[in-house]
Amino acid sequence: MSNAHDIKPLNDNIGLEEAAQGFAAIGSEPRLDVLLALVRAGHKGLTVGEIQQKTGIPASTLSHHLRFLSAARLIEQTKDGRTIHNQAAFTHIEALANFLLRECC
């Protein structure tokens, strides 16, 4: 886990490998559901419990999906005591969308 201050903004020119990793992460309906919940929450983000309430995904499975999304840099996680806050990584999500528009349209 990292602090939000440690995360470097992504260049809009992401490569094929990074784009494939991002698209693979949202290729799962539950992970897409989690990401959409975080996008809707805005920069405030959600705790793991709040995500669980909004998506209905069991805690053990949710943990797996959050790790996958974090590894793909689609979400950022910060720890505050025993609470983990999750936020959509809007800069990276935008870079991923721009990659698709640039390469495919």
Task: Label every model-predicted segment.
Residues 1-22, 36-40, 90-105:
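Amphipathic alpha-helical dimerization/coiled-coil segments
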Residues 17-61, 80-92:
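N-terminal helix-turn-helix DNA-binding core of bacterial DNA-binding proteins
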Residues 73:
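Glycine-centered, phosphate/nucleic-acid-interacting loop/turn motifs that mediate DNA/RNA or nucleotide
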Residues 66-67:
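Short, hydrophobic-biased segments on the C-terminal half of alpha helices
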Residues 77:
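Short beta-strand "wing" residues that participate in macromolecule-binding interfaces
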